[in-house]
Regions:
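Positively charged n-region of N-terminal signal peptides that target proteins for export
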Residues: 1-4
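Bacterial N-terminal signal peptides
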Residues: 7-16
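Sec/Tat signal peptide C-region and signal peptidase I cleavage site
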Residues: 18-22
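Soluble, non-membrane globular domain cores that form compact, hydrophobic packing
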Residues: 23-133, 139-428
C-alpha cells in the first residue's frame, strides 16, 4: 500500500510541474508584431521614419487553402499552362480577391529571375502607409542565397550579412543600391522593373532586409532602420499599440483570416464630403446636404477602424471593427452603424448598400462587442456572412469563372478608396 501511494504521489508531482502548452499566436498578430507602429498624420505630414494612412494584410497561403487550391505555380505564366479549372480557381482565390495596392499588383507579373523568389514563397503580405512612406513586408519561405544573387545581379550591394547562428537564429542580409541605403527615394524611370514588388513605380530601389522567413523594404532609410529594429526585436511593434492590438485580436478571435485592413477615422472623412464628391456640380447639392444632415445620427468617435475577411466553418465572414476605450460606446456604435448600413445608399453606384450585399449573398448580422483581455479595450464588430463560394455568383460579370473569396472585403475597400463609406463617418 505504501508503495502504491508513493507511485501516485510521484505521478501527481509530475502532473503539477509539466507546463501548459503555449497558445499559438494567430498569423495576423504574429505578422503585425513585425511592423513599425503607426502615427495618425495627414498625407505629406508623416514624420520621418514613420508611416500613416492604411495597412493592408493578405495571407496568400490561407487564401489558397480555404478554396481548396492545390496548385502552387511559380508565377502566373506557369499558371496559364494549367487546366482552366485550376487556373481560374487559383486566380479567384488570390488575384481577384486581393486589395488593390501597387505592390500586390506587381505579384501578377512577378518574375523570379528578377526578384529572387516566386509565388510559392509567399505567406503573409503587409503593405503599410501612403507613398512615398509606404513599406512592404512579405513573410514566407525564401532561399536567401538565391535572393542575394538576384539582387546583386541587379546592381544591389550587400551592406550587411549574418549567417544562421548555432542556436537556430535567422541569417539576414541588408541590400541597398550602389548609390547607398539613403538613396531609396531616388527616381530612375529607366530602371523600373516590371514584376518586382520591391521596386518603386518610378524605378526607386529601396533598401531591403532579407531572411529565409521574410523580406522587408521601404524607400525611406530612417523608416527602414526602425523597421529592421522591430523585426529584430529591438523596438516596439504595431502590436504594442493597444488600439491596433485590440482590432487585430477582434478580427482573429474566431476567424481563419484571409485579409485585413487597418486605418484611422480621418481616412473615412465626413458624410458631407462623400455627398459632395458624388454630386459635383449638382444644382440641388445644398438641398441634398440639408436633407442628409437632418437624418444624421452621430456615433461615438472611434480610435481605429479595421476591416477583416476570413472563414468560419463554411461561411465567409466580412467584419467592420471599430475600437473604443469602453464597451458601452462600442455597443452603441455597433447598433447605429448596423442601422445605417441597412438604409444607406452607395453614392458611387447610386444603389442601396442592402442591395449590394444581397447581390453577393451577404447577410448583415447583429452587431457584437469584443473586449480584449490583453488591453482592456473594446471594439464594435459588425459582420456580414456569406456562403464560401464554389461556383459562379455573378455569371455576367465573372465570365463563368469562380467568384472571388472576398467580395465583401473588396466592396468595403473599394468604398474606402472612393470615400463611399459614409455610414462609418463620425461627423457630418
Amino acid at each position: 500500500m505504501q508503495r502504491w501511494w508513493s507511485v501516485a504521489l510521484c505521478t501527481l508531482l509530475v502532473l503539477v510541474v509539466v507546463p501548459a502548452q503555449a497558445q499559438e499566436m494567430p498569423p495576423l498578430i504574429e505578422t503585425l508584431s513585425l511592423v513599425l507602429p503607426a502615427v495618425d498624420a495627414p498625407p505629406g505630414d508623416t514624420p520621418p521614419g514613420s508611416w500613416s494612412g492604411v495597412l493592408f494584410y493578405s495571407d496568400w497561403e490561407t487564401m489558397l487553402n480555404v478554396r481548396g487550391v492545390s496548385a502552387r505555380p511559380a508565377d502566373f505564366d506557369e499558371l496559364d499552362t494549367m487546366p482552366d479549372e485550376v487556373s481560374d480557381l487559383y486566380s479567384a482565390a488570390t488575384l481577384f480577391s486581393l486589395a488593390n495596392t501597387p505592390a500586390l499588383a506587381e505579384l501578377v507579373v512577378l518574375d523570379a529571375g528578377v526578384t529572387g523568389f516566386d509565388l510559392r514563397s509567399l505567406g503573409q503580405i503587409v503593405v503599410t502607409g501612403d507613398p512615398p512612406d509606404d513599406a512592404l513586408l512579405i513573410r514566407g519561405n525564401f532561399n536567401l542565397e538565391a535572393f542575394i544573387e538576384a539582387r546583386t545581379a541587379a546592381g544591389f550591394v550587400v551592406e550587411r550579412e549574418t549567417r544562421t547562428s548555432a542556436w537556430g537564429g535567422f541569417g539576414a542580409a541588408v541590400l541597398c543600391s550602389a548609390e547607398g541605403c539613403d538613396q531609396g527615394r531616388m527616381i530612375d524611370p529607366a530602371n523600373r522593373r516590371v514584376g518586382d514588388p520591391l521596386y518603386g513605380n518610378l524605378g526607386q530601389r529601396s533598401p531591403i532586409y532579407a531572411r529565409e522567413d521574410l523580406v522587408f523594404a521601404t524607400r525611406d532609410e530612417i523608416h527602414f532602420n526602425r523597421g529592421v529594429g522591430v523585426i529584430e526585436g529591438e523596438r516596439e511593434s504595431l502590436m504594442d499599440d493597444p488600439l491596433f492590438r485590440t482590432a487585430a485580436e477582434a478580427i482573429s478571435a474566431d476567424l481563419t483570416v484571409m485579409q485585413a485592413m487597418f486605418t484611422f477615422p480621418r481616412v473615412i472623412g465626413a458624410v458631407s464630403d462623400s455627398i459632395a464628391m458624388a454630386n459635383i456640380g449638382a444644382p440641388n447639392l445644398d438641398a441634398l446636404l440639408a436633407e442628409a444632415e437632418a437624418t444624421f445620427t452621430p456615433i461615438p468617435a472611434y480610435e481605429i477602424l479595421a476591416f477583416g475577411s476570413g472563414v468560419r466553418g463554411e461561411q465567409v465572414i466580412t467584419q467592420i471593427v471599430l475600437v473604443y476605450r469602453n464597451s458601452a460606446d462600442a455597443q452603441n456604435a455597433g447598433n447605429i452603424v448596423a442601422e445605417r448600413i441597412a438604409t444607406a445608399v452607395s453614392l458611387s453606384g447610386n444603389r442601396p448598400w442592402a442591395e449590394l450585399l444581397e447581390d453577393r449573398s451577404m447577410i448583415l448580422t447583429a452587431p457584437a462587442v469584443f473586449t480584449s483581455e490583453t488591453t482592456g479595450l473594446s471594439a464594435a464588430v459588425i459582420e456580414f456572412t456569406a456562403p464560401l463560394p464554389t461556383t459562379i455568383r455573378l455569371a455576367e460579370e465573372s465570365q463563368d469563372r469562380p467568384a472571388p473569396s472576398d467580395e465583401g472585403y473588396l466592396l468595403l475597400v473599394r468604398g474606402l478608396n472612393m470615400r463611399d463609406l459614409g455610414f462609418l463617418a463620425i461627423s457630418f
